[in-house]
């Protein structure tokens, strides 16, 4: 992604490729891949107008296509353009909030921008169109100047804001937690197995105690269809350490329904004896282009500084369309082959993924070009605070 961004600045007609990406949203997994700032920066660098993005939003298909995937990336790009001082993007967001099929998404985007001057009059639209549930979804957890301004004008929004604040102050009764703390391990396991009221709390209490009995519970719940109870077990097991390795090795090898959790544990706590297994897993994932399956092996091999993984890491970096992998690949490369990783870290300074940019800022060799890029990242108010701070430190 970083290489493409650098090439775009030198290639005539690259703008149409940028617009095409915004229109069709090429993200492999939109839930965990970020491209809005990446495309917005390209539009700024290439001096591309926002008009074609607006044309995409207001295409007649907007009112016939029920899925919000068609406009999600375009709205994010416009929001990022506003943050990059391209204010002409704001009226497009306003107009889509007023006229678009997915008006709530645009309204939510404008609220997130936190600038009351961009949302004058939209409080009436929000109060008229949103039921109580939608208003609750519109209100962020923290202070937001747009919502505060709207609440001063609209009683329903003020009531929704009051409900959100009250919910934030509410705490779970201490008695329930104290009761779980007094139960025996066997009682907690029985409560968790019943999967009724209190089961989630019992699972987390078992996790807090780091009892190995939770591994037995995992073998019962994880092979079944996905559920919130199995998810709670996975979250609780994240607090465990190397004591889970013997079971994790069995899970990863047996494919009995717990293999994903087993691989995560091996990635986090495995030793050098696990390198051959992790290599086999990565080789298979790359060969099948099953990029979801590559995440844990990459993380583990990078942590173990397994030099034999470098060719596969380079292949994954080049071939994978799954941006979620990119921070893990770059981190693994910098740990296993620092010299080889230098060109990848330079490329990463222009990447779409926050984690890649952060690793690149920390590791890229200092040259005239990279110093200029670090300075730009430091001064970019649309950039994530952690990246700006790291860029400032490297640039000193």
Predicted region positions:
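Extended amphipathic alpha-helical repeat scaffolds
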Residues: 1-199, 211, 383-387, 392-396
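Residue-level detector of extended alpha-helical repeat arrays and alpha-solenoid scaffolds
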Residues: 36, 71-74, 103, 196-200, ...
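Core register positions within helices of long alpha-helical scaffolds
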Residues: 7-8, 42, 77-80, 109-112, ...
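Amphipathic alpha-helical scaffolding segments comprising HEAT/armadillo-like alpha-solenoid repeats
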Residues: 13-25, 48-63, 83-96, 116-127, ...
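Short inter-helical turns and helix N-cap capping residues of alpha-solenoid HEAT/ARM repeat scaffolds
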Residues: 67, 99, 130, 194-196, ...
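C-terminal structured domains
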Residues: 292, 296, 315, 322-335, ...
């Amino acid at each position: 992604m970083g290489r493409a961004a650098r090439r775009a600045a030198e290639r005539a007609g690259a703008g149409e490729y940028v617009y095409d990406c915004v229109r069709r949203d090429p993200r492999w997994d939109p839930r965990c891949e970020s491209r809005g700032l990446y495309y917005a920066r390209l539009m700024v660098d290439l001096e591309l107008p926002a008009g074609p993005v607006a044309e995409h939003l207001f295409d007649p298909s907007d009112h016939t296509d029920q899925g919000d995937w068609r406009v999600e990336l375009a709205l994010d790009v416009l929001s990022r353009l506003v943050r990059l001082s391209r204010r002409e993007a704001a009226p497009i967001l306003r107009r889509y909030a007023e006229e678009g099929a997915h008006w709530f998404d645009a309204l939510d985007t404008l609220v997130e921008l936190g600038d009351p001057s961009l949302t004058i009059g939209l409080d009436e639209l929000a109060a008229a169109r949103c039921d109580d549930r939608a208003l609750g979804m519109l209100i962020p957890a923290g202070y937001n100047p747009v919502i505060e301004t709207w609440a001063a004008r609209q009683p329903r929004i003020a009531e929704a804001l009051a409900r959100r604040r009250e919910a934030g102050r509410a705490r779970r009764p201490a008695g329930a937690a104290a009761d779980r703390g007094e139960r025996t391990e066997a009682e907690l396991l029985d409560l968790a197995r019943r999967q009724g009221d209190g089961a989630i709390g019992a699972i987390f209490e078992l996790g807090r105690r780091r009892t190995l009995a939770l591994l037995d519970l995992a073998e019962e719940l994880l092979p079944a269809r996905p559920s919130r109870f199995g998810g709670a077990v996975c979250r609780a097991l994240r607090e465990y350490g190397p004591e889970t390795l013997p079971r994790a090795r069995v899970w990863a090898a047996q494919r009995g329904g717990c293999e994903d959790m087993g691989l995560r544990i091996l990635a986090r706590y495995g030793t050098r004896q696990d390198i051959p297994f992790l290599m086999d897993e990565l080789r298979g994932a790359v060969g099948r282009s099953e990029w979801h399956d590559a995440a844990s092996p990459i993380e583990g091999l990078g942590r173990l500084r397994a030099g034999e993984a470098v060719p596969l890491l380079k292949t994954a970096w080049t071939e994978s369309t799954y941006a979620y992998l990119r921070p893990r690949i770059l981190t693994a490369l910098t740990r296993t082959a620092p010299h080889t990783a230098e060109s990848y870290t330079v490329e990463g300074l222009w990447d779409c993924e926050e984690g890649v940019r952060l690793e690149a800022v920390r590791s890229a060799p200092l040259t005239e070009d990279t110093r200029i890029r670090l300075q730009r990242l430091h001064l970019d108010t649309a950039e994530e605070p952690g990246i700006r701070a790291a860029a400032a430190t490297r640039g000193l």
